Amino acid sequence: MSIKLIAVDMDGTFLSDQKTYNRERFMAQYQQMKAQGIRFVVASGNQYYQLISFFPEIANEIAFVAENGGWVVSEGKDVFNGELSKDAFTTVVEHLLTRPEVEIIACGKNSAYTLKKYDDAMKTVAEMYYHRLEYVDNFDNLEDIFFKFGLNLSDELIPQVQKALHEAIGDIMVP
């Protein structure tokens, strides 16, 4: 049996702790994969635009499973968009806004969106992971295809917030 595809996660797997990789070595390995007919796939919860920034030379040759599977692109062409309906998006946002301990990033195809009112520390972290990020006054009337939400909250609150979100919106999304 021969290898047909190699898929890698980025953070903590393909990338070093400094969010880099040995490009020269990888490009040599990639050329070997191509010669053997092996597809290379980047799979990550990260934004598509961040992922392609790591592979500018070959972004239109490889596949990306971005946004935790919400957006799949192969050889520069959309394969899948896990679009939330407008009603589902609104329901989720309305619920998340009732939780002041949660800072929200709405992840869309054109951009990610977060609120202007959030503090600079949160914005700095968000900018590391979202190459396209817009600051908005609210989440009303955003025109985009939305895949998921990124949430920022303190680690000790995660179990209780996750449980509460599952109960409140688990029929729409898996928290």
Annotate each predicted stretch with a short phrase.
Residues 1-2, 59:
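Short, small/polar residue-rich loop motifs at catalytic or cofactor-binding pockets
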Residues 2-19, 44:
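Asp-based phosphoryl-transfer active-site loop
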Residues 8, 71-74, 140-144:
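Short, basic/glycine-rich phosphate-binding loops at helix/coil junctions
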Residues 11-21, 89-90, 124-128:
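An N-terminal domain-start capping segment
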Residues 16-17, 79-80, 148:
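Short, contiguous strand/loop micro-motifs
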Residues 24-122:
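Active-site phosphate-binding/coordination module
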Residues 95, 101-103, 107-175:
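Conserved acidic, metal-coordinating active-site core of Asp-based
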